[in-house]
Amino acid sequence: MPRIEGVDVPDDKRGEIALTDIYGVGQSRASEILEKAEVSVDKRPREWTESETKRVRRIIEEDYTVEGQLRTEVQMNIKRLKEIGCYRGKRHREGLPVNGQRTRTNARTRKGKRKTVAGRSQSTQKK
C-alpha cells in the first residue's frame, strides 16, 4: 500500500480511483497525474513498481497543493473573507449558505438542526 502525502493509497482499487483518497485529488486530476507519470490508469497501486510510485509521489508533491496544505489554504481564504467583512465572509460567519441559495426552506446542512419556534395561538391570530 503506497503512502503518498501522508495517505495510504488503497491497493485493491484502480490507480485513478485510488488516488482520489488524497484530499484535493479528484478523478480528472488523478488521471492527469498518472498520465504525467506514465503509469497505466487501469493498473492497481500494488502492481506499481517502486519507480512508478516515486514518479507519482514526486508529481503530486511538486505540482499540486493537497491534503493539509490545501485545507490550510482554504481556511485562510475563508478567514480573509470574514476579516474584510464582505458578503461572503458574513455568510460564513453566520453559518448560512454563501452562494445565493434560498434559506426560507432548505439550507438545513448549513443552518444545522431545526430550531422550533412556537407558532401563534388560535385566539391571538390576526382576523
Swiss-Prot record:
Biological process (GO), any one: translation
Biased composition (Basic residues): 105-117
Pfam hit, one: Ribosomal_S13
Any single GO CC term annotated in Swiss-Prot or TrEMBL for this entry: cytosol
Keyword tRNA-binding: yes
Keyword annotations from UniProtKB, A to Z: Ribonucleoprotein, Ribosomal protein, RNA-binding, rRNA-binding, tRNA-binding
Region (Disordered), start-end ranges: 90-127
Listed InterPro entries: Rbsml_uS13_C, Ribosomal_uS13, Ribosomal_uS13-like_H2TH, Ribosomal_uS13_bac-type, Ribosomal_uS13_CS
Single annotated GO MF: rRNA binding
Stretches that traverse the bilayer: none
PROSITE patterns, per the entry: RIBOSOMAL_S13_1, RIBOSOMAL_S13_2
Coiled coil ranges: none
HAMAP family assigned to the protein according to its UniProt record, in alphabetical order: Ribosomal_uS13
Protein role: Located at the top of the head of the 30S subunit, it contacts several helices of the 16S rRNA. In the 70S ribosome it contacts the 23S rRNA (bridge B1a) and protein L5 of the 50S subunit (bridge B1b), connecting the 2 subunits; these bridges are implicated in subunit movement. Contacts the tRNAs in the A and P-sites.
Quaternary structure, from the entry: Part of the 30S ribosomal subunit. Forms a loose heterodimer with protein S19. Forms two bridges to the 50S subunit in the 70S ribosome.
Family: Belongs to the universal ribosomal protein uS13 family.
Name by which UniProt lists this protein: Small ribosomal subunit protein uS13
